[in-house]
């Protein structure tokens, strides 16, 4: 697939936390914007930041040069834990997955593509009931908007298993994995990483559409160049 063909609602999820979802979201948003599409980015659940700090979605928007009005965070929980756990420890009532799905449809109206960045992996609890990204996919589909799904994964030893488990979990719920992205690729990959690059599509059962260079997460120019390369090479 060509990443610039994405439209509608696109869920960017991952095999784990800290796999590069935010930078990958920024790269995809930039590629779509450079192709002429109107893009919005949503992070429904953010944890572990003070209210005056920029969140992941704000970082993604800045890196991709997305207008601030099109960069949305719905709820923020204080401790750097799964949203369900962080909200429970803080005594917070946070929006349910059903409420979030409805709001995403409202906020996506009028945009060519809406990127929704998850938190952690696909089974991590997001709302007070412990519903996760898979439940969000279900909720959007019930509302007539089957989302595209991008899975961000690691390069290192063990990623084939984690990637396969994640993609199988998504398919077992009746959803398609459109593509996978390696969220952080080192300058000097080791033997395991080089082998993983060759084998990860088979493990995932989905195409690898991008390998994001490590350490570009603070450089908008590098993100936008990576996005250009992504659009040109597929």
Language-model segments: residues:
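Hydrophobic anchor at the start of a short beta-strand
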Residues: 38-39, 114, 147-149, 177-178
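Inter-motif core of Ras-like GTPase G domains
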Residues: 127-155
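Hydrophobic anchor at the beta1->P-loop junction of P-loop NTPases
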Residues: 12-13
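C-terminal lobe/tail of nucleotide-utilizing enzymes
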Residues: 2-3, 167-234
């Amino acid at each position: 697939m060509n990443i610039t063909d994405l439209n509608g609602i696109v869920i960017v999820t991952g095999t784990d936390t800290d796999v590069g979802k935010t930078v990958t979201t920024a790269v995809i948003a930039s590629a779509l914007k450079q192709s002429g599409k109107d893009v919005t980015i949503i992070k429904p659940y953010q944890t572990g930041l003070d209210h005056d700090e920029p969140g992941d979605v704000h970082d993604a928007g800045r890196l991709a040069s997305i207008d601030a009005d099109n960069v949305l965070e719905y709820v923020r929980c204080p401790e750097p834990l799964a949203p369900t756990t962080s909200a429970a420890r803080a005594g917070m009532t946070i929006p349910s997955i059903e409420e979030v799905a409805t709001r995403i449809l409202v906020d996506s109206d009028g945009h060519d593509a809406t990127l929704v960045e998850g938190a952690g992996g696909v089974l991590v609890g997001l709302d007070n009931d412990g519903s996760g990204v898979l439940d969000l996919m279900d909720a959007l589909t019930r509302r007539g908007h089957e989302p595209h799904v991008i899975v961000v994964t690691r390069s290192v030893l063990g990623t084939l298993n984690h990637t396969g488990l994640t993609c199988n979990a998504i398919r077992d719920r009746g959803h398609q994995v459109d593509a996978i992205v390696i969220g952080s690729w080192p300058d000097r990959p080791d033997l395991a990483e080089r082998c993983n690059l060759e084998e990860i599509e088979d493990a995932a059962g989905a195409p690898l559409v991008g390998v994001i260079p490590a350490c570009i997460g603070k450089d908008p120019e590098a993100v936008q160049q990576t996005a250009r390369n992504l659009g040109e090479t597929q």
